[in-house]
Amino acid sequence: MNLTFLIPTRIETEDRLRNIISSVTYLLKHTDAKVIVKEVAPHNTFLFRGLSEVKKRVDTSNLTSLYEESNDPLFCKSKVLNDLIIESDTKFVANYDADCILPVESYHQAYYALDSGQADVVYPYQCGVYQWKANYNMEIYNSFMNTLSTNVLDKEKQLSNSTIGWTQFINRQKYIDCYMMNENFVSWGCEDDEFYFRMSTLGNRIARVNNYVYHLEHSRTHNSWFSNPNFNNNYHLWNTIKTFDRQQLMDYY
């Protein structure tokens, strides 16, 4: 695969640590793509507590782990994704939420849609009610890590809505040409909406894979919920941008 998974992270809780260990291991097991993790946080938790767990189970020669020390309480996912886009060197990239797991075939179908020239952006799940919210306690975590199979996640799951978050597969040059991520969206909220709107408005062909996405459930901090102190700013920015036509959007960027 001429593909790199871009995983921005700040590991603020034990369940988020389990989730990134799980998703990175799963990606390395089931694809031959590159994976780059960039942690921006006061401490390099992934390197010192996560990486060894991944190495117990899979070859990590395709994995790169980056770290930037930061005491800023707000995690700017958009900025970290932009850093990762520049760091990558493959024809295609995938923004990837560390709490996201897909059926194995979905990765390959999304990649094929890009590689065959059918699409510029692929959402590897359907829009509607195609999210499995998977309970991910220690017992399920241990079972999943031993099998690396979504069958384990099917034991305790709840159907929920799915729209535009989690992960997107993208032609890297198109991504750059369309201004990458908007770093004015700080911490959590509305950045995924704006990205979809912009890629569509600028003429990219957007496709979907007809399947589900699993979300490994976790506790929420201000960096992953409406309690983000910058959420209102993000919301107002999105409400402004979504009124733009193509030329106004290009002028803005």
Question: Model-found features: residue ranges?
Answer:
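Short beta-strand-to-loop acidic/aromatic patch adjacent to the donor-nucleotide binding site
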Residues: 91-101
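Conserved catalytic core of nucleotide-sugar-dependent glycosyltransferases
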Residues: 103-183
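Glycine-rich, basic loop-to-helix element that forms the pyrophosphate-binding segment
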Residues: 71-87
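N-proximal low-complexity "stem/linker" segments adjacent to membrane-targeting elements
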Residues: 1-26
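C-terminal catalytic/acceptor-binding lobe
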Residues: 16-19, 162, 184-253
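Cell-envelope/extracellular polymer assembly enzymes that use nucleotide-activated donors
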Residues: 2-6, 34, 194
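Acidic donor-binding segment of Leloir-type glycosyltransferases
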Residues: 26-69
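Active-site acidic short loop of glycosyltransferases
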Residues: 88-91, 180
